[in-house]
């Protein structure tokens, strides 16, 4: 820790960094153990998706509300409560022996994690107000967050191999206790006497809309996308979204001030946030399945292979920021997104090789990671820098919410495409195969990485089916991020519909 910081400030920064390490690890380490959870807890493919989506939906639910609560009741107090809750819910995740209980515990963990994330920013913003100290604090916060995200796969895989999958969750109990002890002596309490009221209507309608859409996509094959039940759920998602927009328009203190979307730089950057989560981050949920079930690697080797995908996201942001200052975010953000898409197309080619392995996947993984690293920092800085200082907190909340919402939806979309690609190959490869409805459960088992326990099905057919499914997902990720790169590029070049105050 830099010597320039006082002892109390160093303790506060250490507490915040420990909590952001926990949050980052819970996003990136869990994908590495999904194949293990499938075996140990007998989780099916949909349940694996909900283990991830329960967390992201919960984070989205609590993000904006926590900022208001922290301003009103004390940022230190809410930070400590959220961190303690994260430790307790992590303990619940680690001791469960039932997948449904794990999904519920993951939702509760996401609520506490989202609250913890917002409090981290609030604590740092208040405690480190000098220019140099502030830069140091946020610099360390970003580095530790990046380590959690970038090295999470290998950390999760190593813990699962050396100890047990349960310790991927239980380790956070230790971190949470340390963070709370540091926070007690280090973080200064602060409040905002002008804190507004909670936007409960906005919070609930947005969360309901995201949940219903994710549920419709994930459970649609079983319910029937065109069935009365399926259409009712889809209708609820649309109605909730409309209700959210109305609530934000009439609320005196909305979570989302829709007027900021009239600022092209802000809107273009938010599209960039969504684009990263239509491709890069949701695919990290499924890539360990390909490395383990498709390429035959164990959890540690799969985690090492994933470093090619994640490490560039740690080393490229400084270059992305320099390029943004030189060529403008409106050029760098779409270019970074285009690079991610190129990486996905190369991964698709690598997975379709006659004998695919980590070397055939390496170029695409590296290029996708480089593209993410070039894009992420300019997106964050542009969303907050394109609005006035009094709107910066709201702009940051919209940015994070856009990431979480698009991540949640695209975890479901990629899962559906993966299973659909597997199903399409099975229908072509198996003579006299039953109809799609009967083959769908088998396709989901293969998509979950459960290829070994498919009796009577040639191993080559299983592998080819899995490869086709992942090919569909990579194609979707590449085309999707390219499309949004084009949208972002166009938006950046439109005239502002209102002055960027």
Q: Language-model segments: what does each one mean?
A:
Residues 1-185, 327, 348:
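Transmembrane-helix bundle of Major Facilitator Superfamily
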Residues 1-6, 451-463, 491-501:
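Intrinsic disorder in cytosolic terminal tails and internal cytosolic loops
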Residues 11-25, 30-32, 201, 228-236, ...:
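12-transmembrane solute porter fold
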Residues 37-38, 69-70, 155-163, 217, ...:
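Interfacial helix-cap and linker-helix signal at transmembrane-aqueous boundaries
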Residues 85-95, 175-182, 239-243, 315, ...:
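Transmembrane-helix signature of multi-pass solute transporters
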Residues 139, 161-273, 279, 297, ...:
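Hydrophobic transmembrane-helix bundles of small-molecule transporters
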Residues 161-173, 219-230, 420-479:
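A membrane-interface helix-boundary motif in multi-pass transporters
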């Amino acid at each position: 820790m830099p010597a320039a910081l006082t002892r109390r400030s160093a303790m506060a920064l250490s507490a915040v960094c420990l909590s952001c390490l926990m949050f980052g690890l819970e996003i990136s380490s869990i994908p590495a153990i999904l194949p293990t959870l499938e075996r140990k807890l007998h989780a099916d493919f949909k349940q694996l998706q909900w283990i991830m989506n329960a967390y992201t939906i919960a984070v989205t639910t609590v993000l904006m509300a926590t900022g208001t609560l922290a301003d009103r009741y004390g940022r230190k107090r809410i930070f400590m409560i959220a961190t303690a809750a994260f430790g307790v819910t992590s303990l619940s995740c680690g001791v469960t022996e039932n997948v449904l209980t794990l999904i519920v515990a993951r939702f509760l963990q996401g609520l506490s994690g989202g609250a913890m994330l917002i409090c981290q920013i609030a604590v740092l913003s208040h405690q480190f107000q000098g220019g140099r100290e502030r830069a140091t604090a946020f610099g360390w916060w970003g580095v530790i967050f990046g380590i959690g995200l970038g090295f999470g796969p290998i950390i999760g895989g190593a813990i699962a191999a050396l100890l047990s999958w349960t310790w991927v969750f239980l380790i956070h109990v230790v971190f949470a206790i340390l963070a709370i002890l540091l926070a007690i002596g280090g973080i200064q309490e602060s409040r905002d006497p002008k804190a507004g009221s909670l936007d409960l209507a906005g919070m609930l309608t947005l969360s309901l809309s995201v949940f219903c859409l994710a549920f419709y996509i994930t459970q649609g094959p079983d319910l029937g996308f065109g069935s009365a039940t399926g259409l009712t759920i889809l209708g609820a998602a649309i109605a909730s979204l409309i209700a959210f927009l109305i609530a934000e328009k009439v609320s005196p203190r909305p979570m989302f001030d829709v007027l900021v979307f009239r600022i092209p730089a802000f809107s273009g950057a938010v599209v960039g946030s969504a684009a990263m989560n239509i491709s890069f981050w949701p695919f990290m949920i499924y890539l360990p399945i390909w490395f383990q079930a498709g390429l035959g690697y164990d959890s540690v080797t799969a985690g090492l292979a994933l470093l090619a995908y994640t490490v560039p996201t740690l080393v490229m942001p400084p270059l992305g920021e320099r390029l943004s200052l030189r060529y403008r975010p409106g050029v760098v953000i779409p270019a970074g997104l285009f690079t991610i898409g190129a990486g996905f197309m190369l991964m698709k080619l690598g997975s379709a090789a006659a004998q695919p392995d980590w070397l055939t996947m390496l170029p695409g993984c590296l290029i996708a990671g480089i593209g993410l690293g070039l894009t992420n920092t300019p997106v964050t800085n542009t969303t907050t820098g394109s609005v006035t200082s009094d709107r910066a907190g709201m702009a940051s909340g919209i940015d994070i919410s856009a990431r979480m919402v698009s991540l949640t939806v695209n975890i479901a979309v990629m899962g559906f495409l993966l299973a659909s690609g597997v199903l399409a190959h099975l229908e072509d490869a198996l003579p006299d195969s039953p109809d799609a409805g009967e083959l769908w459960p088998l396709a989901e088992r293969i998509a979950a990485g459960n290829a070994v326990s498919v009796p009577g099905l040639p191993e080559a057919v299983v592998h080819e089916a899995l490869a086709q499914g992942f090919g569909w997902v990579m194609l979707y990720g590449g085309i999707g991020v390219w499309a949004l790169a084009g949208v972002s590029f166009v938006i950046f070049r439109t005239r502002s519909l209102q002055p960027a105050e």
